[in-house]
Amino acid sequence: DAGNATVAVADLPSQGQQTYRLILQGGPFPHDKDGSVFGNRERLLPRERRGYYREYTVETPRARDRGARRIVCGGQRPSTPDACYYTSDHYSSFRKIVQ
């Protein structure tokens, strides 16, 4: 459950800080899938209705694809999320992003 583990924005990898800034400014995002609905099928994040969570790619240097790093944010309006979570292992674990 992502409720306990946190990570400060300043402690995210630089690519994560960049993605977080893009989320708050509403893009533009480099990947087509950025901003798509995240289903929370793993049920590691607090349970919410479908469409509440959206996922964004955190670039991984030298990865040939989108890599395993993501930021998932929840809320009514994508650029003013209620909460965002960072995963470095493709949704196996999450840490809540704090200021």
Q: Model-predicted segments: where are they?
A:
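N-terminal secretory signal peptides
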Residues: 1-44
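Functional cores of ribonucleases/endoribonucleases
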Residues: 27-99
